Amino acid sequence: MVRRALRLAAGTASLAAGTWLLRALHGTPAALGADAASIRAVSEQSPNYRDGAFVNLDPASMFTLDREELRLIVWELVARHSASRPAAPIPLASPNIYRGDASRLAVSWFGHSTALLEIDGYRVLTDPVWSDRCSPSDVVGPQRLHPPPVQLAALPAVDAVVISHDHYDHLDIDTVVALVGMQRAPFLVPLGVGAHLRSWGVPQDRIVELDWNQSAQVDELTVVCVPARHFSGRFLSRNTTLWASWAFVGPNHRAYFGGDTGYTKSFTQIGADHGPFDLTLLPIGAYNTAWPDIHMNPEEAVRAHLDVTDSGSGMLVPVHWGTFRLAPHPWGEPVERLLAAAEPEHVTVAVPLPGQRVDPTGPMRLHPWWRL
C-alpha cells in the first residue's frame, strides 16, 4: 500500500512537472526569432559586422562577476521581499491619449522602454512590450511589477514603431503580432532585427531595417538609426543583430530615444549631427558595477543628456526602470540618483507615472510618486 502510494505521488509529481515544463515552453520556439542564416543575410552587409558579429564603437565588456557576486544577485532577484521590489503597488495614471492630431512635442511613458512620442504631428511607439514577462516563456523570466497602463487596442494610430534591439524586454513577439493587425505603421528596426519580424509574419513592406547613421522618412519626420553601446541576442547566439538608439527630427522639434545603452562617446557626435534635442528618453535602470559598459547608471544618463542637448537644455524623461527587475539595485534608487545628479547641472527632469503624458512646453510639477 505504501509503495503504491509512493508510486502514485511520484507519478503525480512527474505529471505536474511535465505539465509545468510544457506550459513554460509553450510558444518558446517562435519567440526565439529568426534562424541564423536569415539574420546573417542582412547583417553581413554592414561595415559594423565583423567575424560574424556586430561590434560596439566603444569596446564594451559584458559581465564581470565572481561566484559570490552572482549568488547575491540571483538571490536578490528571486527573493519575494527585497529592495529591488516596490514597497507598495505602483500607481498608474489614467492615460490621456488624444484621438486628434499629435502634439508638437509630448511623451506618454507606459513602463520600461515603451513610450508614445508625439513630435510635430507624428506619433512614434518605442520598444512596445505589453506581455506579462520579458522572456521567451510566459511562465518563467522577469515579470511585470505593474500592468500596462493602457490596453494595446486603445492606442491611437501611430506613424511608426521603433525597436532599439532584440532583447526580450524591448522586442516582444506577442505585442508585435498584435500591432500588425491593429496598426498600419511601419516597423523601423536595426539591421538583422527585421528577420525576427518576418519570421513572425510582419509583411516585408512594413519593415525598414537600418544601419547606424542611416535614416528613413515618415512623411516630414526624419528617423535616424544611431549608435548605442550594448549587445543583442535572443538565445545562444550573441550580437548577430544590431542594437541602436534613435533620433527623431521633425520640422520644428527634435527628440532622442536612447534605447538600451551604456555611456558612449558617440553621444557627443549624435548631438552634433542631429541635435540639440528638445526631449531625451534615456535609460537609467538595470545598472550594476558588474556590467558598467552596457547599462548606464543615472549619473551617466545626465551626462548623456548634456552631450546631446545644448548645455543641458530640453527635458530628460527616464526610461528602462520601474517595470521589470533586471538588476538588484533598490527599486526607486534610479530616480533618486537621477534627480540628485540633474540638479547641479540644471537639467529639467520629468518622471511620469506609468501611463502619464508629459508636455515639455506645459506647466510641470514633479510629484515623488515613486516614494511608496
Curated annotation (Swiss-Prot):
Q: Which InterPro entries match?
A: Metallo-B-lactamas, NAPE-PLD, RibonucZ/Hydroxyglut_hydro
Q: Please give the PANTHER family that the UniProt record associates with this protein.
A: N-ACYL-PHOSPHATIDYLETHANOLAMINE-HYDROLYZING PHOSPHOLIPASE D
Q: Which family does it belong to?
A: To K.pneumoniae RomA.
- GO cellular component terms listed in the entry, alphabetical order: cytoplasm
What organism is this sequence from?
Mycobacterium bovis (strain ATCC BAA-935 / AF2122/97)
| Keyword Signal among UniProt keywords | yes
Q: Which residues form the signal peptide?
A: 1-33
Q: Recorded GO terms, molecular function?
A: N-acylphosphatidylethanolamine-specific phospholipase D activity; zinc ion binding
Q: Which UniProt keywords apply?
A: Signal
Q: What is this protein called?
A: Uncharacterized protein Mb0930
